[in-house]
């Protein structure tokens, strides 16, 4: 006869953070969080950074932070793909970013360089049909963004990211490029964008590695009926691309839907 045992685990956490303007061009951010788990133990999670306020609304930031997360009850015990042997994930993140504005604030731009070193990142492996720890990860890359407000009706935005992975991460792309535009006119609003994804890892299982590349076009239109309601129609993957984010699970082709939003 099988006997059931009740597993009781306690957890508490606390944090403190502060921001101090050292002078007109330099600010300091610092903080620390303590996370105690009766099964895993106590973990200190610090972060800190400097922000340099430059002329013409430009800003340079440097930051170092630690990330830490215990597996949840759902990930460990509830429904497939549960795994009771999951370990806590942790990582160190180093970032250097620069942001600025031009044309009287009509144009904004930014670039971000980062390096991540982590261990035991929790992910779902479709081939094994369960949650697993990925082992060690070491990633670095760059992210850029650009926004331009043409006039009170039109706005354009674009972003690009490049990611180098020493150890491939499931569902992470090497290149991602997006360009879109937004239009508003009285009660109407319209937004559309095209996204190009290259080198997305759909499977990282040894011997079954697989990558995908695809282009997505999405569109959304809204009409405000009154102060608390609007109707919308949106289309996703309008180019009807065949692609997967996780191997063995194809994403829908062209999808169109509409509805009413009511806000109270």
Mark where each language-model region is.
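Short, small-residue-biased leader/transition segments that mark boundaries at the very start
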Residues: 3-8
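Residues that define the transmembrane beta-barrel architecture of outer-membrane proteins
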Residues: 10-12, 42-44, 90-94, 136-142, ...
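Gram-negative outer-membrane beta-barrel transporters
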Residues: 21-25, 110-117, 133-202, 227-230, ...
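Transmembrane beta-strands of outer-membrane beta-barrel proteins
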Residues: 28-30, 46, 60-62, 107-111, ...
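Membrane-embedded beta-barrel scaffold of Gram-negative outer-membrane proteins
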Residues: 53, 59-61, 88-140, 147-149, ...
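C-terminal beta-signal and adjacent terminal beta-strands/loops
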Residues: 119, 124, 156, 196-203, ...
């Amino acid at each position: 006869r099988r006997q059931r045992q009740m597993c009781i685990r306690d957890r508490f956490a606390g944090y403190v953070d502060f921001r101090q303007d050292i002078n007109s061009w330099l600010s300091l951010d610092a903080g620390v969080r303590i996370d105690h788990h009766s099964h895993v133990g106590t973990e200190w999670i610090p972060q800190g950074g400097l922000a340099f306020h430059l002329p013409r609304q430009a800003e340079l930031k440097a930051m170092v932070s630690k990330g830490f997360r215990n597996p949840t009850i759902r990930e460990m015990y509830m429904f497939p793909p549960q795994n009771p042997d999951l370990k806590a994930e942790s990582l160190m993140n180093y970032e250097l970013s620069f942001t600025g504005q031009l044309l009287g604030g009509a144009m904004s731009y930014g670039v971000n360089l980062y390096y991540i070193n982590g261990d035991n990142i929790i992910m779902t492996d479709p081939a094994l049909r369960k949650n697993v720890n990925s082992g060690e990860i070491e990633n670095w890359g760059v992210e850029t963004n650009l926004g331009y407000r043409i006039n009170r009706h039109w706005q354009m935005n674009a972003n690009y990211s490049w990611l180098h992975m020493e150890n491939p991460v499931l569902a992470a792309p090497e290149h991602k490029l997006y360009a879109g535009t937004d239009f508003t006119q009285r009660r109407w609003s319209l937004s559309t964008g095209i996204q190009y994804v290259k080198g997305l890892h759909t499977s990282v299982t040894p011997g079954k590695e697989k990558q995908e590349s695809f282009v997505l076009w999405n569109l959304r239109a809204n009409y405000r009926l009154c102060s608390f309601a609007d109707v919308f129609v949106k289309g996703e993957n309008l180019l009807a691309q065949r692609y997967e984010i996780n191997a063995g699970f194809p994403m829908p082709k062209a999808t169109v839907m509409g509805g009413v939003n009511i806000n109270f």
